[in-house]
C-alpha cells in the first residue's frame, strides 16, 4: 500500500529535529532554507517531513495504462495473436515423444501473416514496380500445416544426438544411448560439406541412420542451396567460409566443388533469365504490332575508369513505366586460366594448351581491346542478334551523350538492318545534367574575367550575388522539368526552356506556376533574379538545350534511369569492391534480370531448374520482398519524398559534395 502524506507524529518530530539540525550547516540545508523563503512555517515543516520520510516511489500500477499497438499508416491494423494454452511437446525436456504435425496443440499458423500478402485494393500499382509485380502479391498464400514443418534449421548437433539416443532401438527395444559394462552404442558422422550422415550403432549391433539433408540428384540439397544463397547476397567463397566459421559450422565446399556448384547455378539462372527476357520481348509485340521498337542501351563496368576487366551492356525496352530487360551482354578482356598457364608453361606448350582450351569453349575472354571499347562492341552484338533472338528491330536508340555506341551500330558494316536507319534519341536526364555541367564550366572559365556591375568591378560570374551552385542546380532541374512536362510538343518545350532564362533575367511573362510571382501569396518576383552581366554570359548556353534538333530527340521524354537502376542491382549481387571472374559477373546479371523483370518470386523457377523444392519459407520470403518493393516504390513516389530528395541535392551542393562522387563502389551499401 502507498504511504499517506500528512503531518508527522511526536516521535517522528523528535527525530526530524535532530536530523534537521545537521542540515542547517550543510550544502543541502542551505538549498532548503532558500526554498523555505517561498513557504510558510507549516508548509516548510511538511516539506521537510516529506524529505525525511522519503517520497514513495511510483510503480507501473500507479500510472495510466499504455494504449495497445494498433499499427500506423504504413502497417495498418495489427491483429492480436491467439495464445495457445497447451504447450508443444518439444517444450517438455523430459518428453521423448516426437511431434505430430496433425496435433492441434502445436501452434502452427495455417497461412502467411497479412503483411506478406497485402490487400490488392490498398496497394498502389501505378508505380513501375507495382505494374511488374502486381501478380505476385494478389491475395494471401495458404499453406498446409505439414508444409510448415519443412526446410532447414540451425540445430546444435550435440542436442540432436542426445535426443536421438533417447529413442528405442527397433531391434532390442532399448534406448540407443543406454550403455552396459561390456558393450556400448556410439555415433559416427559422415560429413559432406553442409550435409551429414549420422550412424547410430546400438549395443545389439543394429544401426540407425539419420540424414540432415535430402538429395537433389547426386548432391545434397543443403550443399546446393548454400552457394545459391551466398551468390544472391553478393558473397563469394571467402565470405561463405567466414560466415560458417562465426556460426561454428563446418567449412564450405572446397573451391573446386564450389566452382562445380556455381556452374550448375549459372546454367539454371541463365535458362530462367532467357525466358524472362523472351517474355519481355513478347510484351513489346503485344503492345506494338510493329517489329520496330524503341530501346534504351547503356554500359557499366566492374571498376571505375578505363582499367576494368569486366563490362556489361544492358538493353531495356522503353514502354512507359513498365520497362524491362530485353537483352544483356557481358564482356571480359581477360581469362584467369589463361593468365595462370601462361606463367607456368613455355610459349610453345602454352599455344598448344590455349588451342585446346579455346576449342572446348572454356576461355572466358570474349573481347580484345580496352574497357572503353566494351560498350560499343557489346551494343553491336546485341543489335545484330535482335531479329534472330526476339524477332524485333531496335530502330530507335535511346542513349547518353556518348555517341560511340550509336556510331558503331549506325555505321556498322555490313549494316545491322537492311534498308533501315537507326534513330538516335537523347536521354532527358543526361540533357539536364549537361546543362548543369556547361554552366559550371562557364563559371570556371570566367573566374578571373572582370565585369562592371553597379559601378563596381567584380571578377567572374560566380560567388555571392552571382551564379552559385544552388542556382545552377535549380536551373538544371527546371530545364529537365521543361522537357518532361511538354512531351511531344516541340514549340512548348522550346518556350519553356527559354522561360528559365527570362525568369532569371527578371522577365515574368513566360513563367509557369513554379515562379514565385505566379503564386497566390504574390511572392517576391526578383527573388531568383541574377545580375545582367551574368545573364548575358550564360545566354549562349541556353541555345544548346533550346535547339530544335536536340529537342526533337527529347520529345519522347524518356531517360536511362531504368538502366542505372538495373546496374545498381547487379553490383549489389556482385560488389565492385571484390574482383571476380566474368562467369560470376554474368551470374549476377542473369539473377538481377529475373528479379528486375518479374520480382523475387520468379526466382522459384531457378530452384525448379536445380531440381530443388523451394519450400514454404522461400516462397514466404520472396513474396514479402516483392511486397516491400512495391511499398517502397509508392513511398518514394510521393511529392513529399521527391521534395526531400531535391533538398538533399541542394544541401550536397552547398556543402561541396559533388553528386558524381556518390557512384563509387559500395557507396549505396
What name fits each language-model region?
Residues 208-215, 238, 242, 312-394, ...:
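Electropositive, glycine- and tryptophan-enriched low-complexity nucleic-acid-binding patches
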Amino acid at each position: 500500500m502507498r504511504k499517506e502524506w500528512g503531518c508527522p507524529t511526536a516521535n517522528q518530530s523528535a527525530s526530524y529535529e535532530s536530523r534537521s539540525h545537521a542540515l542547517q550547516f550543510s550544502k543541502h540545508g542551505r538549498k532548503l532554507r532558500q526554498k523555505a523563503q517561498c513557504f510558510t512555517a507549516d508548509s516548510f515543516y511538511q516539506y521537510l517531513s516529506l524529505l525525511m520520510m522519503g517520497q514513495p516511489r511510483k510503480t507501473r500500477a500507479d500510472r495510466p495504462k499504455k494504449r495497445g499497438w494498433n499499427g500506423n499508416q504504413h502497417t495498418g491494423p495489427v491483429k492480436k495473436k491467439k495464445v495457445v494454452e497447451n504447450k508443444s511437446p518439444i517444450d517438455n525436456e523430459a518428453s521423448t515423444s516426437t511431434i505430430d504435425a496433425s496435433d492441434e496443440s502445436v501452434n502452427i499458423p495455417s497461412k502467411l501473416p497479412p503483411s506478406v500478402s497485402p490487400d490488392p485494393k490498398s496497394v498502389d500499382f501505378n508505380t513501375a514496380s507495382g505494374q511488374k509485380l502486381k501478380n505476385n502479391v494478389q491475395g494471401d498464400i495458404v499453406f498446409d500445416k505439414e508444409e510448415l514443418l519443412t526446410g532447414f534449421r540451425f540445430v546444435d548437433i550435440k542436442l540432436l544426438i542426445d535426443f536421438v539416443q533417447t529413442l528405442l532401438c527397433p531391434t532390442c527395444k532399448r534406448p540407443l544411448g543406454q550403455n552396459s559394462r561390456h558393450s556400448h552404442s556410439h555415433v559416427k558422422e559422415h560429413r559432406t560439406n553442409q550435409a551429414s550422415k549420422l550412424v547410430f550403432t546400438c549395443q545389439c549391433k543394429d544401426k540407425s541412420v539419420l540424414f540432415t539433408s535430402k538429395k537433389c540428384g547426386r548432391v545434397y540439397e543443403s550443399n546446393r542451396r548454400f552457394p545459391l544463397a551466398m551468390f544472391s547476397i553478393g558473397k563469394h567463397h571467402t565470405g561463405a567460409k567466414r560466415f560458417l566459421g562465426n556460426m561454428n559450422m563446418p567449412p564450405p565446399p572446397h573451391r573446386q566443388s564450389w566452382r562445380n556448384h556455381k556452374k550448375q547455378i549459372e546454367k539454371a539462372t541463365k535458362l530462367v533469365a532467357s525466358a524472362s527476357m523472351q517474355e519481355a520481348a513478347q510484351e513489346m509485340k503485344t503492345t506494338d504490332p510493329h517489329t520496330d521498337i524503341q530501346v534504351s542501351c547503356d554500359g557499366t563496368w566492374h571498376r571505375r575508369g578505363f582499367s576494368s576487366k569486366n563490362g556489361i551492356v544492358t538493353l531495356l525496352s522503353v514502354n512507359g513505366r513498365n520497362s524491362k530487360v530485353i537483352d544483356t551482354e557481358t564482356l571480359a578482356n581477360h581469362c584467369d586460366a589463361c593468365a595462370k598457364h601462361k606463367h607456368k608453361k613455355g610459349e610453345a606448350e602454352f599455344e598448344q594448351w590455349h588451342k585446346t582450351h579455346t576449342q572446348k569453349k572454356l576461355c572466358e575472354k570474349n573481347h580484345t581491346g580496352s574497357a572503353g571499347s566494351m560498350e560499343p562492341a557489346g551494343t553491336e552484338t546485341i543489335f545484330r542478334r535482335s531479329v534472330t533472338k526476339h524477332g524485333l528491330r531496335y530502330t530507335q536508340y535511346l542513349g547518353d551523350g556518348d555517341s560511340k555506341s550509336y556510331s558503331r551500330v549506325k555505321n556498322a558494316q555490313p549494316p545491322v538492318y537492311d534498308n533501315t536507319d537507326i534513330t538516335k534519341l537523347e536521354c532527358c536526364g543526361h540533357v539536364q545534367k549537361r546543362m548543369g555541367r556547361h554552366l559550371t564550366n562557364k563559371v570556371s572559365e570566367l573566374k578571373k574575367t572582370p565585369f562592371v556591375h553597379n559601378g563596381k568591378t567584380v571578377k567572374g560570374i560566380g560567388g555571392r550575388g552571382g551564379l552559385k551552385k544552388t542556382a545552377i542546380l535549380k536551373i538544371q532541374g527546371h530545364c529537365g522539368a521543361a522537357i518532361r512536362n511538354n512531351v511531344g510538343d516541340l514549340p512548348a518545350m522550346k518556350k519553356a526552356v527559354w522561360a528559365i532564362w527570362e525568369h532569371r533575367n527578371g522577365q515574368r511573362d513566360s513563367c509557369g506556376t513554379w515562379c514565385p510571382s505566379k503564386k497566390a501569396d504574390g511572392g517576391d518576383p526578383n527573388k531568383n533574379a541574377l545580375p545582367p552581366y551574368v545573364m548575358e554570359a550564360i545566354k549562349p548556353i541556353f541555345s544548346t538545350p533550346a535547339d530544335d534538333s536536340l529537342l526533337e530527340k527529347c520529345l519522347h521524354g524518356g531517360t536511362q534511369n531504368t538502366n542505372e537502376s538495373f546496374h545498381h542491382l547487379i553490383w549489389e549481387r556482385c560488389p565492385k569492391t571484390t574482383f571476380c571472374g566474368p562467369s560470376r559477373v554474368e551470374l549476377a546479371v542473369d539473377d538481377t534480370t529475373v528479379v528486375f523483370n518479374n520480382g523475387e518470386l520468379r526466382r522459384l523457377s531457378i530452384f525448379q531448374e536445380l531440381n530443388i523444392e523451394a519450400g514454404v519459407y522461400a516462397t514466404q520470403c520472396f513474396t514479402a520482398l516483392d511486397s516491400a518493393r512495391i511499398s517502397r516504390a509508392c513511398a518514394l513516389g510521393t511529392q513529399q519524398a521527391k521534395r526531400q530528395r531535391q533538398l538533399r541535392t541542394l544541401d550536397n551542393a552547398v556543402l561541396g559534395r559533388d553528386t558524381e562522387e556518390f557512384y563509387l563502389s559500395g557507396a549505396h551499401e
